[in-house]
Amino acid sequence: MKSVVCHSAKDLRIENTELPALGEHQLRVNVAYGGICGSDLHYYQHGGFGTVRIKQPIALGHEVSGVVDALGSGVQGTVKGQRIAISPSRPCGHCRFCQAGQHNHCLNMRFYGSAMPFPHIQGAFSEQLIIEGYQAHPIADHLSLSEAALAEPLSVGLHAIQRAGSVLGKQVLVTGCGPIGSLLIGALRRAGAARIVAADIADLPLKCAKEMGADETINLKTDAAALDKYKVDKGQFDAVFEASGSEAALRVGLDTIVPRGVLITVGMGGDISLPMTQIVAKEVDLRGTFRFHAEFATAVRFLNEGLVNGKPVITGILPVERAIEAFDLAADKSQSLKVQISFQNA
């Protein structure tokens, strides 16, 4: 079967790989669509991110949907031909973090397409996958398999909101309106945020943010002072979600957040310096957010029930044979948001 495998920076190959045997409680799935994530791009462009480096060939991808092709003898509640979104989160269930309900911090996590552990955890950009039964989340008849592959990035946004606490009736700023930022805006709208301001440095993501429910969009590249009005009286936003990984964006968030507001760092852009005096003086609650687990089921339900419409986020779909072109397109933020690879009829 064909798989999209990264060997090192700028060395992405479409290779034939072997499918593992089907276990008793597992499913064999024909992969339909896979979305290219920012972490996939980091592996492709730079060979990793931060201290995480590719040390062996790794199949990329963790945002996938598909159709069940075969079932292990012990699987119940799933049928052949069922259309599913596939959760990439595979915690052990036994370590102290899993036992505490913090599955995203599992000490033995097998998250698809991750070079954090060694040997690396192979990803989901393959024509077929063997998955655990619990990873399969059925999708509604009306939901396309392309949209179903958005469940993963939507889950990231839902976990970020969970980390922030209630946003009901709150004034919210989102900086960075790529796929995760835009889907986060859709989730914030559903969670009852009173007003959502979206900021970015490009028009395309801001257009998407507007379609996803932002009340105001601001291009900080063309109007650097546009957020100054929100700095008055010690800040105006109850919550800030920083989804770009930019130090400048984080500082803007600190300037515009109210005292004792919650600032959630969603994007990972590397280590930065922080204005600790400002954080202390404003008593800002600075929180990280990392992946998700239980939120995946909620994300699928939101998509199934039309509570969040992810269609505006998808800007390109290319067949697996053009995977390298798809990665290059995904890296061009002037013309793309979420680019997906199609494995159907590959």
Where are the model-predicted features located?
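C-terminal hydrophobic helical "lid"/dimerization subdomain
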Residues: 3, 251-255, 293, 297-346
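N-terminal glycine-rich cofactor-binding segment
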Residues: 5-21, 38-70, 85-87, 106-122
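Glycine-rich beta-strand-centered segment in the early N-terminal region that forms part
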Residues: 20-34, 49-99, 140-143
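NAD(P)H dinucleotide-binding glycine-rich loop of Rossmann-like/cofactor-binding domains
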Residues: 94-175
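Adenosine-nucleotide cofactor-binding segment
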Residues: 174-177, 189-252
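N-terminal Rossmann-fold NAD(P) dinucleotide-binding loop
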Residues: 181-182
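Glycine-centered, small-residue-biased loops immediately flanking beta-strands
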Residues: 261
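Rossmann-fold NAD(P)-binding glycine/threonine-rich loop
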Residues: 267-283
